UniProtKB/Swiss-Prot annotation:
Organism listed in the record: Bos taurus
Record Pfam families: PID, SH2
GO CC terms in record: cytoplasm; focal adhesion; plasma membrane
Protein name: SHC-transforming protein 1
Gene Ontology terms for molecular function: receptor tyrosine kinase binding
Residues with PTM Phosphotyrosine: Y239, Y240, Y317
């Protein structure tokens, strides 16, 4: 990894400061982490995070998925975004430099700028959970980008060395490149800390990879943001399940994230207290039949409740480093990928290894569930959100459909108070659940709530399952 030494006591910095120019070792670490090691204790990055006082300079819309671009183009995109913001914000460092005209390829990738909050001093908190941007004076949260929503991070070029840029998705700006101006010599520390957070997040992924989550290009939750919310739901928004104490973003987004440390195997929880650890309730016996005889399902005991903690509060995967080298070393075949000494750099945020790792046959349990659902009249197979909503006529109508984007995921669609609701039924561990209970199967969940006339609580309102919308044969 090429390094440049700055004068005037400036710290050694990675050229361009990109997160994406290294490979992973077989143990999930950077081949070239800083020679002095990571700057912060791991438990701090995995816990409250590390904070820096920087200036938020705005963001520039990114019109293409960063995963569709090669590493060099990604770097050009972030540096061009830095230059655009430098020109637009008075007093920005590097603003006096004359920028070359934006090339046609880059102009087709970058869109409009959003300079709301530009120039505002903020506290940037970096952790394995998110990058949190909070106004330094009024403590207002400007943005909270979960790790799974971040696709690339980079420093500036030699003329904009004090900038850090990262590309993330949120419900307001969609996919955008956010620009941070750092005090002199601090930009590399910020980049290094983000790199440390991603390495630790990746190790968490290796210890507990999700079984059913396919890492497609989607958004993470966006909590307590100061951005004005959109009036229309973007086409790539999906669903938002109710979490205690949280308000859903307008239109809803996918939240398939699991807090680390939630342990299975405990029974019915007591009310929250300092002595009550959070846990997941035990599932019902797997061998107990749930399909076929409705009377047998009706007589099942109620499912054990889950803990009250926010089950999906953290992302279950992040955009991290390519594992080609580790896979080749393990397989003992194929030439190594040249990366460090002169060849194309590797991309820290390459999602292909995750897609490859998750492209596997479904477990027997999910196969059995799919077979069981095919016998249920209210199951419609793969159906889009729009198509499902068109089938709902009166309050209490409901159906279950298979997600068109996530294999093994099932969605409950129902009509309540004239508004359609869409609830994900399978968590990242492959468990059928609502906010309060775990179930043996989707059929058990539906029959339990329908036969006992119990509503499903979601987003602060109730969804009652009264009239199943049967599929047409």
């Amino acid at each position: 990894m090429n390094k440049l030494s700055g004068g005037g006591g400036r710290r050694t910095r990675v050229e361009g400061g990109q997160l994406g120019g290294e490979e992973w070792t077989r143990h999930g670490s950077f081949v070239n982490k800083p020679t002095r090691g990571w700057l912060h204790p791991n438990d701090k990055v995995m816990g409250p995070g590390v904070s820096y006082l920087v200036r938020y300079m705005g963001c520039v819309e990114v019109l293409q998925s960063m995963r569709a671009l090669d590493f060099n183009t990604r770097t050009q995109v972030t540096r061009e975004a830095i230059s655009l913001v430098c020109e637009a914000v008075p007093g920005a460092k590097g603003a006096t430099r004359r920028r070359k005209p934006c090339s046609r390829p880059l102009s087709s990738i970058l869109g409009r700028s959003n300079l709301k909050f530009a120039g505002m001093p903020i506290t940037l908190t970096v952790s394995t959970s998110s990058l949190n941007l909070m106004a330094a004076d009024c403590k207002q949260i400007i943005a909270n980008h979960h790790m799974q929503s971040i696709s690339f991070a980079s420093g500036g070029d030699p003329d904009t060395a004090e900038y850090v840029a990262y590309v993330a998705k949120d419900p307001v700006n969609q996919r955008a490149c956010h620009i941070l101006e750092c005090p002199e010599g601090l930009a590399q520390d910020v980049i290094s800390t983000i790199g440390q957070a991603f390495e630790l997040r990746f190790k968490q992924y290796l210890r507990n990879p999700p079984r059913l989550v396919t890492p497609h290009d989607r958004m993470a939750g966006f909590d307590g943001s100061a951005w004005d919310e959109e009036e229309e739901e973007p086409p790539d928004h999906q669903y938002y399940n109710d979490f205690p104490g949280k308000e859903p973003p307008l239109g809803g987004v996918v939240d398939m994230r699991l807090r680390e440390g939630a342990l299975p195997g405990a029974a019915r929880p007591t009310p929250p207290s300092a002595q009550t650890p959070s846990h997941l309730g035990a599932t019902l016996p797997v061998g107990q039949p749930a399909g076929g005889d409705p009377e047998a399902r009706r007589q099942m005991p109620p499912p054990p409740p889950s803990s009250g903690r926010e089950l999906f509060d953290d992302p279950s995967y992040v955009n991290v480093q390519n594992l080609d080298k580790a896979r080749q070393a393990g397989a003992g075949a194929g030439p190594p990928n040249p990366t460090i000494n002169g060849s194309a750099p590797r991309d820290l945020f390459d999602m292909k290894p995750f897609e490859d790792a998750l492209r596997m046959p479904p477990p027997p349990q999910s196969t059995a569930m799919a077979e069981q659902l095919r016998g249920e009249p209210w199951f419609h197979g793969k159906l889009s959100r729009r198509e499902a909503e068109a089938l709902l006529q009166v309050n209490g109508d409901f159906l279950v459909r298979e997600s068109t984007t996530t294999p093994g995921q099932y969605v409950l669609t129902g009509l309540q108070s004239g508004q359609p609701k869409h609830l994900l039924l399978v968590d990242p561990e492959g468990v059928v659940r609502t906010k309060d209970h775990r179930f043996e199967s989707v059929s058990h969940l539906i029959s339990y709530h329908m036969d006992n006339h119990l509503p499903i609580i979601s987003a602060g309102s109730e969804l009652c399952l009264q009239q199943p919308v049967e599929r047409k044969l």
